[in-house]
């Protein structure tokens, strides 16, 4: 039972690690994007590439924002994330992650709670687990994932996750569309009371990993193998940009071997203050030590 609880906690914490990367940047699979807002097509002569370049620079320069996201992946999980993230000097921030469905939520209930706190620092990620986990892990409530360890233990996929965690920003979604060469203006739409412009495009995940990361050839080959095994090929990214050229909504949809993947994220209060503290060392267990037990 002790080992089961530790293993479950590590798995859930790892999924939550990716929640930060995807909420702030991009990471999914293939399919078709969409929106619950209505819109009209772009006018003749409009250059979506130029508009997106402006949005990419404006969003990158804003440095921080409040983030709300919902993510689903087949029958494995559905979850929400709510908090603040900053990206001026690596990804930092706090998110409250709640598992609302799927096998992950069932596992969390067995551990006493369906919610957890996630803290992101430039060199590591921390997940606060429940008391049940602490009882089986020497009384420690937090799990630490150092990004350098992810690269060492996770091969190409770990190296890519490390790269994304240290370099990701909300404007990564805009960069994806720019790099894909397949982007169109869908129309003008209202999102949460704001007038926005909606853009959509299809991206090749493995190809963009090569264009937008610092991975070596062997790491890229390893990542591509992992993506292929997961059924990840292409995905559709939809973004909504306001009149300040800031990203206010992102939708990614696709398919994996685990089922349909979808994430919707909303961004607001750009420039908000973000303060993150490293959890107490005495209450923190390193995941590299936990996996050995």
PLM region spans:
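Subset-of-secretome marker
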Residues: 3-6, 25-293
